[in-house]
Amino acid sequence: SIVPDGGRTTTVTFQAGQSREVIDWLEERQGRQNIYFTVNPVMRPMSSKPKKIDIRGMQAIHVDVDPRVGEDLEAERERALRLLREFKPAPTVIIDSGGGFQGFWLLDQEQRTDGSEERAAELEAYNLQVEVLLQADACHNIDRIMHLPGTVNVPGAKKRKKLPKEALATV
């Protein structure tokens, strides 16, 4: 989780069977901090944001299409969602981050990197291609974090230019 406008960042890795811990952790932060998940699996439990060398492999191609600054927010959100829905092949999952939209194409099989930055760069090229085709945000890195659906996107002062109020991230 990240505190808007700076402050402490908290990173936790939860395992299957820790649903009570997850709920407690989320409730402590909901509406006060932005809560994220890593798109791709890590090699070990993390206590800080993972780097490329911490990523085990790619399980999804991803993209983030945000409204363009200076344009009408609702028209831009409609544009972003339309771009994703009309893209071929269609994303497996579309998340409304509360600002823009994130598209995920789940792979049939994880493409392993085992922390190799060279292999990560090869796989990031797929994200970059989708990013270019959709005129999306620069977020093609394999260690990317994205807003967790079901949590509130809390914009800080800088983000309020694009997202004037809090918004719930949804699938």
Question: For each predicted feature, which ranges?
Answer:
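Catalytic "initiation/cleavage/transfer" segments centered on a nucleophilic residue
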Residues: 132-171
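Signature for HUH/AEP ssDNA processing cores
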Residues: 1-99, 107-125, 132
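Short, structured patches in soluble enzyme cores that scaffold and shape functional sites
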Residues: 105-109, 149-150
